[in-house]
């Protein structure tokens, strides 16, 4: 119908669009889902696009299992009450499609136009369909659906809780976990246990300035013990100028103290004074000397030689003596008064001798306390200078005391032991570096404390945190605090490990049961539609009844007069292009047509199908197939294919006007070189294969290349086609395979019909010599075959030998005509050759690519050349890597050789790196994997032979029991965006099942 829109020949209509209009899989009602087979995310997107009603093409590379997708598209459409016509050119394709229907249990919904039924058989088939509808029972899935929805919702809530961002902080639980894993990745990373409250977290959203201030505080020893044990700690200094002045004052004090102490020591030695231990004692000593000096202006110095208490009593009044209980005769008083006057210096008149003598007595008592032995006082000549120096020192100390008021040692300098004071001044002088940064340190500390960071500052100081970690400590405190708030906010939605595993396990069981019940649900749905249409299509229902009850049943009449009821009873029809045109009237329409083999079917052959449907979906692989002309008579051997008419495939034509989708998931393994080359050069790098481990029951595909040296060998054929040495070598490989691995199917594919014929004849001849190998070559489902590329498209075997079949000229030059690879469709032949093997592909060739000039090659021969070169380069790399591997197992084991110096692999994800660190902490050696395999975990020796039940597979155990087991791991975080975008079914059941199957 789209082709009919081409009003002007040669003018392309605008390209149509195709979109997935279905709700996300995780939001759908399970009761409405009708998929019969598991589908990966890419295939599910294609199925949903089909259900949305769009026409498009599907590129299906070998190994992507397009028939599974076709069955799912058909079942999903039938679940919507639609009819589906499936057309395939090849009987093998339709047979495989039918086998899938039978396996899923919905074969009764199909009408096979290829089956040769008479009228009664056709009538019986429609009657069986009515009986099927009338007996169909709606499965009781209510409890199952509730469990599926509940567990799915819990897993969705868990992932959303991991990824939902806080409206203010713009972070998620997952990003917080990643950041914390990054912060704590190293052994010397941050370790603070300080937590912030919500207001503090809000205030620290922009914390660059705070981080810079903390780092600066660390640079100026803000978190070093020296900063708090410094004699300047808590000093009151506002700026650098005050710090410099304080330091200069200390230097002055040190000098003044030293000079004064020396002078005081000299004075003490001269006067017989005890050496003062404090400035206060110096003050007392100088004070008594000053007073004595004043007294000696009136009295002689010997007045201090003895006590003058009797003189004091004699010169006192009678009342004083009575008050003090002293009795003294007048004669005695007279004598003592005369004696007292003898101490008075000549010319000095003392008005109150009694009071002056009391002063002398007090001074004498104080003098005695300061001298080491009794002696007459002397007044040093430099007394005034000493007093002035002392006053200056005390004044300077008072200035220092203002600065050091809040220090732990205090500021009582005058009562401080002189040695301690001297030591303190020395300490103050020695700590100049900390002093000069003190104002900035105090200012930063005060500023940060005002921001509410006191607890963090105290913690950083208590742990003596190095400057380079300070910033990370702030980050750890912020992110850990934020994470705890986020966890509280999402409490109930986030699942811990045990609950997550339990919920996933419940979902897997429910989803598996749900998929198992899909056929019953689809049959019940078809039965409901049948019941509804009996009412809505009353006339057609009546005609159907009359036909089934009538004497003669004519299918064409039924399809003409009751097409809706026919499609409702049997909503899935399969046919070849020719059977469709022959058996179905042109008026019979279907909702959707699925065109299988569309890359190898000419457009003209599929026009009857295309014009019968509003929705057209073409599946095929234009890179591995092409249409061939229909030939009635047998061709002459060796005759070239007719080239008069250029055939356009259905796929190629529809691809010019319809959007294209590509099945991306490969369900079988390929050698990495083959997969990389095909993916890059043919499939736009859209293909993806699950990684395969050596522990898998389906080992990774392998590619081996063998070049036959023809030098000095004489071939039985004179031309370059099918050299005898290659035929002989391939025959030997076939016999070797039959003997060594008879459980694996085998085929030989060649690049020319002649070479295929010669190899087949050679194998038949060899078999007569080795009859014991005959069972391997017996006919069967996957019997041994030898075919050329044109007949290999539908063939698949465990092992395939691709024999090029091209030799050299007599002069030894390499041929540039590589048979069918060099032909027009050689690129398709190349893809076919590389994709026929499920397990192992062996290429045998007499021509080495190093002998060829790629500029002289054409079509698939160019691809063949480049593939061989890439294979050789990979082999060379692997040889280099093998030589760089660990010490050979044959060497004696010892701790030195067993030590692994390899760096810890960086997986590009901090949580996964944390996993690696934890594995290593348990003695597991971890090495980097390749491709999707994130890492290889080598178990400790004591665990090397033990299975790992949690992973569902046994470890790969070396034949040498001393070699640790190797477990390949595909790892991802459940908060990764790719993980979150995947449906719960994909990430919880399908992906783990795929990885389990591949080891």
What residues fall within each predicted segment?
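Short beta-strand-loop-alpha-helix junction that forms the active-site gateway
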Residues: 932-990
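ASCE P-loop NTPase helicase motor core
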Residues: 44-51, 56-59, 67-69, 73-132, ...
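Charged C-terminal transducer/switch regions of large nucleotide-driven machines
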Residues: 117-120, 128-470
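Conserved helicase/translocase motor-coupling segment
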Residues: 686-764
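Conserved motor-coupling elements within RecA-like helicase/translocase cores
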Residues: 129-130, 563-567, 770-800
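A short beta-strand element within the Helicase C-terminal
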Residues: 588-595, 795-807, 811-815, 841-842
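Conserved helicase NTPase catalytic core signature
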Residues: 1-45, 211, 220, 230-249, ...
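Helicase C-terminal subdomain and adjacent C-terminal extension
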Residues: 632-662, 679, 692, 763, ...
């Amino acid at each position: 119908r789209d082709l009919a829109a081409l009003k002007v020949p040669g003018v392309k209509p605008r390209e149509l669009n195709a979109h997935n209009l279905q709700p996300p899989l995780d939001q759908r009602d399970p009761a409405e889902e009708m998929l019969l087979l598991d589908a990966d995310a890419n295939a599910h997107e294609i199925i949903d696009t089909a259900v949305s009603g769009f026409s498009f093409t599907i590129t299906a590379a070998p190994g992507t299992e397009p028939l599974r997708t076709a069955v799912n598209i058909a079942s999903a459409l039938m679940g919507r009450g639609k009819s589906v016509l499936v057309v395939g050119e090849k009987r093998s394709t339709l047979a495989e499609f039918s086998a899938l229907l039978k396996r899923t249990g919905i074969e009764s919904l199909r009408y096979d136009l290829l089956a040769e039924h008479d009228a009664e058989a056709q009538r019986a088939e429609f009657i069986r369909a009515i009986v099927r509808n009338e007996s169909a029972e709606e499965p009781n899935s209510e409890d199952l659906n509730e469990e599926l929805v509940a567990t799915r919702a819990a897993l969705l809530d868990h992932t959303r809780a991991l990824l939902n961002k806080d409206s203010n902080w713009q972070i998620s639980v997952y990003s917080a976990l990643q950041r914390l894993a990054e912060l704590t990745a190293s052994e010397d990373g941050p370790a603070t246990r300080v937590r912030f409250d919500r207001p503090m977290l809000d205030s620290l959203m922009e914390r660059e300035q705070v981080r810079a201030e903390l780092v600066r505080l660390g640079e100026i020893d803000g978190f070093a013990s020296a900063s708090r044990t410094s004699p300047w700690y808590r000093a009151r200094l506002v700026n650098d100028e005050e710090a410099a002045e304080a330091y200069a004052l200390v230097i002055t004090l040190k000098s003044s103290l030293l000079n004064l102490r020396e002078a005081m020591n000299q004075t003490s030695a001269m006067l017989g004074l005890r050496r003062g231990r404090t400035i206060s004692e110096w003050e007392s000593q100088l004070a008594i000397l000053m007073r004595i000096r004043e007294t000696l202006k009136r009295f002689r110095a010997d007045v201090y030689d003895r006590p003058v208490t009797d003189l004091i009593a004699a010169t006192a009044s009678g009342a004083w003596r009575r008050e003090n209980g002293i009795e003294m005769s007048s004669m005695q008083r007279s004598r003592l008064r005369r004696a007292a006057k003898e101490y008075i210096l000549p010319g000095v008149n003392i008005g109150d001798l009694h009071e002056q003598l009391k002063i002398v007595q007090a001074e004498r008592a104080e003098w005695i306390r300061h001298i080491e032995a009794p002696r007459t006082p002397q007044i040093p000549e430099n007394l005034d200078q000493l007093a002035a120096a002392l006053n200056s020192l005390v004044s300077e100390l008072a200035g220092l005391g203002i600065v050091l008021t809040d220090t732990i040692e205090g500021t009582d300098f005058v009562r401080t032991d002189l040695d301690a004071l001297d030591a303190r001044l020395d300490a103050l002088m020695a700590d100049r570096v900390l002093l000069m940064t003190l104002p900035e340190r105090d200012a930063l500390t005060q500023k940060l404390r005002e921001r509410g960071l006191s607890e963090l500052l105290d913690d950083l100081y208590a742990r003596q945190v190095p400057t380079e970690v300070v910033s990370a400590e702030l980050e750890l405190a912020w992110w850990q605090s934020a994470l705890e708030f986020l966890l509280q906010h999402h409490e109930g939605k986030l699942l811990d490990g045990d609950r997550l595993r339990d919920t996933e396990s419940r979902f897997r069981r429910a989803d598996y049961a749900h998929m198992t019940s899909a056929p019953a649900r689809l049959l019940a749905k078809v039965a409901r539609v049948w019941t509804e249409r009996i009412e809505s299509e009353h006339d057609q229902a009546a005609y159907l009844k009359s036909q089934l009850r009538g004497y003669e049943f004519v299918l064409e009449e039924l399809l003409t007069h009751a097409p809706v009821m026919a499609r409702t009873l049997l909503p899935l029809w399969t046919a070849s292009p020719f059977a469709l045109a022959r058996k179905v009237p042109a008026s019979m329409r279907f909702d959707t047509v699925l065109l299988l083999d569309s890359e190898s079917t000419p457009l003209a052959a599929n026009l009857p199908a295309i014009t019968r449907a509003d929705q057209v979906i073409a599946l095929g692989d234009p890179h591995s197939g092409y249409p061939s002309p229909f030939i009635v008579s047998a061709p002459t051997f060796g005759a070239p294919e007719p080239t008069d008419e250029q055939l356009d495939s259905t796929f190629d034509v529809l691809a010019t006007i319809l959007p294209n989708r590509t099945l991306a998931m490969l369900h079988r393994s390929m050698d990495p070189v083959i997969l990389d080359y095909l993916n890059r050069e043919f499939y736009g790098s859209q293909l993806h294969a699950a990684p395969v481990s050596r522990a898998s029951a389906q080992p990774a595909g392998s590619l081996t290349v063998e070049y036959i040296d023809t030098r000095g060998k004489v071939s039985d054929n004179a031309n370059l086609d099918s050299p005898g040495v290659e035929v002989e070598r391939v025959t030997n490989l076939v016999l070797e395979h039959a003997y060594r691995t008879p459980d694996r199917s085998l085929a030989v594919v060649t690049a020319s019909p002649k070479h295929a014929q010669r190899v087949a004849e050679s194998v038949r001849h060899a078999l007569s010599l080795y009859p014991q190998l005959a069972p391997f070559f017996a006919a069967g489902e996957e019997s041994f075959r030898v075919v050329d590329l044109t007949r290999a498209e539908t063939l698949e075997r465990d092992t395939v030998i691709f024999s090029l079949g091209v030799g050299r000229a007599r002069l030894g030059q390499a041929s540039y005509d590589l048979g069918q690879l060099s032909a027009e469709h050689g690129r398709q032949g190349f893809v076919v050759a590389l994709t026929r093997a499920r397990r192992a592909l062996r290429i045998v060739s007499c021509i080495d690519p190093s002998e060829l000039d790629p500029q002289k090659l054409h079509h698939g021969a160019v691809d063949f050349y480049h593939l061989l070169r890439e294979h050789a380069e990979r082999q060379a790399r692997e040889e280099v890597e093998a030589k760089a591997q660990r010490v050979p197992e044959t060497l004696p084991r010892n701790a030195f050789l067993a030590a692994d110096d390899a760096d810890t692999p960086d997986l590009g994800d901090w949580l996964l790196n944390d996993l690696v660190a934890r594995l290593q902490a348990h003695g597991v050696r971890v090495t980097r994997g390749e491709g999707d395999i994130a890492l290889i975990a080598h178990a400790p020796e004591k665990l090397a032979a033990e299975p790992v039940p949690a992973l569902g597979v046994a470890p790969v155990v070396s034949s040498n029991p001393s070699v640790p087991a190797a477990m390949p791991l595909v790892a991802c975080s459940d908060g990764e965006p790719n993980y979150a975008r995947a449906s719960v079914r994909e990430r919880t059941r399908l992906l783990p099942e795929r990885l389990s199957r591949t080891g």
